[in-house]
UniProtKB/Swiss-Prot annotation:
This is Iron-regulated protein FrpA. It comes from Neisseria meningitidis serogroup B (strain ATCC BAA-335 / MC58). Keywords: Calcium, Cell outer membrane, Membrane, Repeat, Secreted, Toxin, Virulence. GO terms for molecular function: calcium ion binding; toxin activity. Coiled coil: none annotated.
Amino acid sequence: MNEGEVVLTPEQIQTLRGYASRGDTYGGWRYLANLGDRYADDAAAIVGKDANLNGLNLWMKKGVENLWDDTVGKKTRLEKFDRVALQHFSQYVDLINENNGRLPNTSEIERSYYKAVTENGVSSSAAIDLVINRSLPDMADGYWALGLGIEAERIHNEQAVNNPNGSERDNRKQLISALDKGFDGSFKEKHFTFLQSVIMDVTKLGVEYTIDGWQKIGGWGNGIINDLYKSVVKREWTGIFEIVNNNIKQFRDLFPNPEGWIDDGHQCFAPWVKETKKRNGKYHVYDPLALDLDGDGIETVAAKGFSGSLFDHTNNGIRTATGWVSADDGLLVRDLNGNGIIDNGAELFGDNTKLADGSFAKHGYAALAELDSNGDNIINAADAAFQSLRVWQDLNQDGISQANELRTLEELGIQSLDLAYKDVNKNLGNGNTLAQQGSYTKTDGTTAKMGDLLLAADNLHSRFKDKVELTAEQAKAANLAGIGRLRDLREAAALSGDLANMLKAYSAAETKEAQLALLDNLIHKWAETDSNWGKKSPMRLSTDWTQTANEGIALTPSQVAQLKKNALVSLSDKAKAAIDAARDRIAVLDAYTGQDSNTLYYMSEEDALNIVKVTNDTYDHLAKNIYQNLLFQTRLQPYLNQISFKMENDTFTLDFSGLVQAFNHVKETNPQKAFVDLAEMLAYGELRSWYEGRRLMTDYVEEAKKAGKFEDYQKVLGQETVALLAKTSGTQADDILQNVGFGHNKNVSLYGNDGNDTLIGGAGNDYLEGGSGSDTYVFGEGFGQDTVYNYDYATGRKDIIRFTDGITADMLTFTREGNHLLIKAKDGSGQVTVQSYFQNDGSGAYRIDEIHFDNGKVLDVATVKELVQQSTDGSDRLYAYQSGNTLNGGLGDDYLYGADGDDLLNGDAGNDSIYSGNGNDTLDGGEGNDALYGYNGNDALNGGEGNDHLNGEDGNDTLIGGAGNDYLEGGSGSDTYVFGKGFGQDAVYNYDYATGRKDIIRFTDGITADMLTFTREGNHLLIKAKDGSGQVTVQSYFQNDGSGAYRIDEIHFDNGKVLDVATVKELVQQSTDGSDRLYAYQSGNTLNGGLGDDYLYGADGDDLLNGDAGNDSIYSGNGNDTLDGGEGNDALYGYNGNDALNGGEGNDHLNGEDGNDTLIGGAGNDYLEGGSGSDTYVFGEGFGQDTVYNYHVDKNSDTMHFKGFKAADVHFIRSGSDLVLSASEQDNVRISGFFYGENHRVDTFVFDDAAISNPDFAKYINAGNNLVQSMSVFGSNTAATGGNVDANIQSVQQPLLVTPSA
């Protein structure tokens, strides 16, 4: 067998014989076509009924009928055509059987048809191959197989050189020989005549018989003849017929498909279908039982509309689109009526299976269980119905069972089906769900999966299983494909007199207003042909969600679990009225979507009103779709009859001259009708090649405006139609696209597509896109705010902007913004933005090659590039090109942009923004507060006067702030910051983490190091002029002790001196006689504050921080630091280490913070706070009036040490919650909050001869109030002021004394 060859099985041949025995030639040929027989596809078209066909197939059928009528007469055709067709089909099946399942070749087909014709007394001139022979008398007489697209391997040479009766013709042999050897120039004219004839014949038949209308006819004929001619010249003989076939199909596709409106409306129905569960409590799915036949699990496919499977699940005679079982698995079925096919869901096993008690099964397993006659929970040979079971493996996935797709269980090696299952509710990811899963057993003892599926339901895409025979008159009626539970409009009208009368009236209505007045009635009358119309109970309202078993499954178990029953929500009168008004529309939409909305479920009034909104929106979309899709079959049909074809320059083109005359004729008596009809033809048709139509529409618009009727006409058209008219697309030809004038100042979009197009935006803010080809954009007076998008990468094209109505170049300004070109009218009346014009410096795919003016002046790209670099006195945007340029901003706040070259960018006056490109650029801000940005190169940035912002970004840049207070940021690379005389108050931000870079500050104009001071503030380095004229702050210089990413590596001076980082670090630790800020480094340092009120900061090392004279602030770091306040009132702060804090002279503030710290207040009245850790407070002779705050939450041991004092020298006095230890009138220590609790106490008091510990305090306090009272008395004793201590007090105090440890 050859790859792709169709070979039928004995079962399939038997199925064909069944079609023959029933006289169903159309069904038999369609069966073969579905198996891949190309000849059968055409044969089915020829024997089919008109109502089943459209486009090319209908043309072929009419062609054969015309052949019979012309050769043997219409009477003979009516009497004998069906007999000939049936005999030919039967003989064709016999040939397949004789060829062991292989399809007949073309010679066998010719002989069969000739035999059928002649044996029924019909002349052989009616043989089918002569249809093409008549059209091609000078070419391939008999070569009909190529024209029909039959497979090459089935084409037998004999049929190309012999008559059907076997007589040979020498001229055909000669022709075939010539074809085999190729053509020469002598055939050219003859071929062209033949092609003209073919196209004209196809066009004539297509117009006459293609019932779908003329909606998309525009442009189909252009280029066909040229393509065919080229094929002949290239000696591709078979290509001629392929192109004929392809273009005929292309012609057919240009007409609106009567089924296409369903897909167009599918999105508008989506919100309605989504709300199904709120109208009937159900998710619509179908429920069959399926078997895994290939061992990889049960696989399914999504519902795919008309391109997928359609099946009558509900036994209502309508096949609907459905999710389906894949071709390698199967459905368990039972042919109940014995007709050899599976007709509907009743013959599957699911919730459409009717049980013996008259109810419907809950699911597939429940349906199958009824066949378990012996009650063993297994279906096998012991059960009576086992032999009647089949597995349907839908090989071609069409939802129609064929004999070769139905297999017995024995053929598949299935021994039994197990009725046990588990609920799995597995989402299969394509709209389908595996609800229950069990297994079946094979004859070899292995098991495989069997499951109950919930298949997705798409009731919109539907086909009735029976066809309505139409009369010739009925077949001429306008038509739309059936949808939901509705037949094709034409068939439905054949069965409903009311609908037929309404369709006739609608088709005869001559104006849009008249059609719209009838549209609702037409929609309703079609809906009333639904078999369920009027049978449903009135819709009720409920908040009680329920599950229903039949007509698809209700909510899945997981979905049910998510819903809770609610008390009935009371609806307002307004909401009830809205629902009542929507009831009729809900019924209509049910018919169109195949739904049943018996109950409206809602959770709130807002929920109910949303359903009403969805209903109304969906109905409005439905009405719009029906109106638009009937438009060209009804009211606009008479105009289409005026379109013809003409031959120009060896090419067929559409001739619209008669159409223009037709509209003008209507306009004479009814201007509004002509206006509206023409507008809708342009808006909803595909007549883009009809330039005269758009010009005619423009004339109609202007006349309507003059007559004061334009707004009225627009209201009749509606907003959507007006919007469509404002957007126009061209074809592959040379189009003229123009704003036809709707909404004078409204936006218009014109798309040229292929070809050399002319786009005229007109008034308003228009978008014009030329597409490929040499396009011209025309702008006249009052052209508005327009945008041109001219992407076309082709070479050799020449795109032009043309200004008319006297517009000259000096009336316009040319500027650049980004890559866009802006052409502005100086009087402010309009602007044209050419998007991306300057991409690739104006040589890219978006350029406009020339700009033309009425006075003959032409600007090329080079001239435009010069114009947009000229500055003005205003705020300009100037851009350099890749080659390198000098740009001068002049006056105004300007934006200057460098490119890839080495550019000189001068801001001049004003607050300018200057951006470098990829080159080594020079940026000069000039006057004003400027922002300068380098980029990738080694750039030089000079801020000039003013407070400027400079950023070097990448590269080794030089930054000169100039006068003013400037901000300088070098970016990456080795950068140099230059400061001269009068440099101002500047900041340097030098973050660059790269290794190997070397950043420098350079002082010029004779500035030397001894003219500057170097100090540190936080992590910043401050370099100040001693005369106060300027300062440079190097931000974060000392981050990571000056080795971080912010450092300046060297500081250079005019005298050649260089300071490195180490030297700068030393300089900033030198004190002065003033108030200094000195910082230690991580390694540990000694800092001396000297004179002045100084700030000293430790770091991570063990630092010695001496405040010396002055009121100093000293801050420890993380090490074990020594802080000495020296003279003055000082503040000392420890940190994390075990620090030693000595206040020295003066009234000092000491805070140990973390660590085991030692705090010595020294002379003066000091405040001491130990913080956390085990701290020691030391007091010596003359320590003054000190306060200790010793609050802590840890369990450390704090000590107060009195050096030079014996225990008897110090008296304990309670003062409120404080404990006062008094050594003399001048020297005492107050422990703040001592009696608040243990967290405030000092644990041990140490004297030269003894120590008192906290446990001793607790002991005596717990024993009684003696100590407390005595201390209270002591508080008023003269001892506090230097008197004698009472003997009682001494006796209480004495037991507390212990000998201090060594």
